[in-house]
């Protein structure tokens, strides 16, 4: 499978234009494009512009409603519950975290939960919204069921990611991971490439290890059995029960407290009905913020400077690889495979846009 490099600014403008065609206003279009490009810049191809075709289909089918306005259904000084009414997940998520941050500025802590939403992209984006306000940020989301429980072969939980961010120097601490071995998007990348995925990522309809990404995706879509494994793989000996438990905790912190559909019931009604939660904490409520920031910065540097394993020259802390990736891709362009490139052109064609007139395409070296 061939890869191409697309200029970040041109691809961003294209995504904003696409969102405008769907009926999103200027700020919404800018936010959605920023979240998509943030994923690609950070090296998270699975959550970047390759998602655009799925969003396009979601808008066409009515799963995503561009005209939906998230509604406050319950609120306290410290918390708020939003019904997204099948809005674009990014729109509801930005709204929710902005509300959580506003509450944290006033009271030291703010929480927002959302139900009846859609896929919201890369979770770290929202945690970093709080970090930029010199706060600790966290967010969680459930997804359509894609993960089998330990010893199971029926998908019951989503990829259910955890995102956490806190200010530090010279770069923030950012942790953003699925509670599955990999997110669905990673399987989609392998399926598009026609390559076998690593064993230990997923199981087939019989609960057996498989390297066939397309087969797993097809089985998930058709409810034929099999799915992605929780963090730790298939056995408690390698920690499978830990990933399974973390996925369940995220389910509680998203769908259960938001009053939404649990992962195994998401999308059964044909509407956007994922749930999310967002937390902002002014950590100054515990003491001297500058001292805490310095302490975290020192710890992170000590981790980087600690003894390396044989053959290794660098130890990374959470968020470092993303910073390195962003710098490289801003300079050299966003890498996009030929399958995703074809999908970007298809989206444009169906919306009356000439992709190649808007975005320069060059073969990756």
Predicted regions and their residues:
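Acidic, glycine/proline-rich low-complexity segments that act as flexible tails and inter-domain linkers
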Residues: 1-8, 13-32, 37-38, 46-66, ...
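Residues forming anionic-ligand binding surfaces in small-molecule and nucleic-acid pockets
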Residues: 73-79, 83, 94-110, 210-231
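Phosphate/diphosphate-binding glycine-rich loops and adjacent basic-rich segments that engage nucleotide
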Residues: 147-221
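Catalytic-core signal marking the mid-to-C-terminal active-site face
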Residues: 2-14, 21, 252, 257, ...
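Secondary-shell segments that build the walls of catalytic and ion/ligand-binding clefts
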Residues: 196-265
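Active-site cofactor/substrate anionic-group-binding motifs, chiefly glycine-
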Residues: 47-101
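A generic, well-ordered mixed alpha/beta core segment in the N-terminal half of proteins
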Residues: 79-171, 177-178
């Amino acid at each position: 499978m061939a890869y191409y490099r697309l200029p970040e600014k041109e691809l961003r403008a294209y995504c904003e234009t696409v969102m405008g065609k769907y009926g999103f206003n200027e700020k919404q279009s800018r936010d959605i494009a920023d979240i998509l490009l943030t994923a690609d810049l950070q090296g998270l191809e699975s959550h970047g512009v390759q998602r655009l075709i799925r969003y396009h289909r979601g808008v066409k089918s009515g799963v995503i409603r561009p005209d939906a306005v998230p509604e406050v259904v319950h609120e306290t000084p410290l918390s708020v519950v939003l019904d997204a009414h099948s809005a674009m997940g990014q729109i509801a998520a930005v709204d929710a975290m902005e509300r959580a941050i506003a509450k944290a500025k006033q009271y030291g802590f703010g929480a927002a939960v959302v139900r009846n939403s859609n896929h919201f992209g890369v979770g770290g984006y929202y945690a970093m919204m709080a970090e930029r306000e010199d706060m600790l940020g966290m967010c969680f989301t459930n997804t359509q069921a894609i993960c089998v429980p330990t010893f199971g072969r029926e998908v019951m939980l989503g990829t259910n990611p955890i995102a956490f961010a806190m200010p530090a120097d010279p770069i923030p601490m950012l942790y953003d991971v699925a509670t599955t071995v990999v997110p669905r998007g990673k399987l989609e990348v392998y399926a598009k490439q026609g390559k076998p995925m690593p064993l230990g990522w997923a199981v087939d309809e019989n609960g057996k290890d498989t390297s066939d990404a397309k087969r797993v995706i097809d089985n998930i879509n058709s409810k034929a059995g099999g799915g992605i494994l929780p963090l730790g793989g298939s056995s408690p000996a390698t920690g499978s029960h830990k990933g399974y438990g973390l996925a369940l905790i995220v389910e509680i912190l998203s769908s259960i407290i938001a009053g939404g559909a649990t992962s195994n019931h998401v999308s059964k009604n044909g509407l956007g009905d994922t749930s999310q939660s967002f937390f902002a904490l002014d950590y100054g409520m515990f003491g001297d913020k500058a001292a805490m920031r310095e302490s975290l910065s020192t710890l992170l540097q000590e981790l980087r400077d600690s003894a390396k394993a044989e053959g290794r020259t660098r130890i990374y802390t959470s968020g470092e690889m993303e910073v390195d990736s962003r710098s490289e891709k801003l300079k050299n362009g966003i890498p996009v495979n030929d399958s995703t490139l074809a999908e970007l052109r298809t989206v444009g064609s169906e919306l009356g846009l000439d992709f190649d007139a808007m975005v320069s395409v060059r073969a990756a070296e």
